[in-house]
């Protein structure tokens, strides 16, 4: 469950290490984002020489959340951290690698490129 001012780890190789959520996309009064939702964020921490630098405003898709999410079969999925992948305007990832597992909900939301790059889909 990601909301404004939430800080997320970046799970790709764009050069950003941490982002801060500015806005949850999908309606004027939408408060929370879960796995597979798109947010607008600013880069808070980045490595030198990366594709993005500190202060850049980017779009990202949430791939892991600490808050558990109920699946249609009755099971729950939750992760140890909140993480996101920075995306381009056409919803493809900006980086070329994805680190760590991602939620299966990304497949339903049609983020196939992220699914194919991820080492594990839970």
Curated annotation (Swiss-Prot):
Q: Name the SMART domains for this protein.
A: Ribosomal_L14 (SM01374)
Q: Name one GO cellular component term.
A: cytosolic large ribosomal subunit
**Where does the sequence pass through the membrane?**
none
Query: GO biological process: what's one of them?
Result: translation
Q: Which GO terms describe its molecular function?
A: large ribosomal subunit rRNA binding; structural constituent of ribosome
Record key words, sorted: Ribonucleoprotein, Ribosomal protein, RNA-binding, rRNA-binding
The family note in this entry says: Belongs to the universal ribosomal protein uL14 family.
Which HAMAP family does the record associate with it? Answer: Ribosomal_uL14 (MF_01367)
Q: How does it assemble?
A: Part of the 50S ribosomal subunit. Forms a cluster with proteins L3 and L19. In the 70S ribosome, L14 and L19 interact and together make contacts with the 16S rRNA in bridges B5 and B8.
The name of this protein is: Large ribosomal subunit protein uL14
What organism is the protein native to? Mycobacterium marinum (strain ATCC BAA-535 / M)
